Amino acid sequence: NKFSTVSRQLKSYQNLALKNNLRIVKILLVAPEFSDDFIYDCEMDTEMNLSLLTASTLSKIFEVFKTSNYQEFPHVLFRDIVINEERIIKALTK
């Protein structure tokens, strides 16, 4: 299954970072879209702090962020498995 392949690769990167004394707070996986099965498998994974972000959502969030009052992106907005575009844009425009 596609998630197991992606998961193995991400865990490999995570282990490499840890060996170099780097701390990983969150892994953001960006893709054009995610299947329901992929999202389900991601939700069941307890080893990585992984969030899924579609490329179109990332682009929209970036455009709103550029016009927001924030100098640094509030990372707490990336707490979901599947990133909620509307919630983040609403928070950035407050």
Task: Annotate each language-model stretch with its function.
Residues 1-93:
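Catalytic core segments in nucleotide and nucleic-acid processing enzymes
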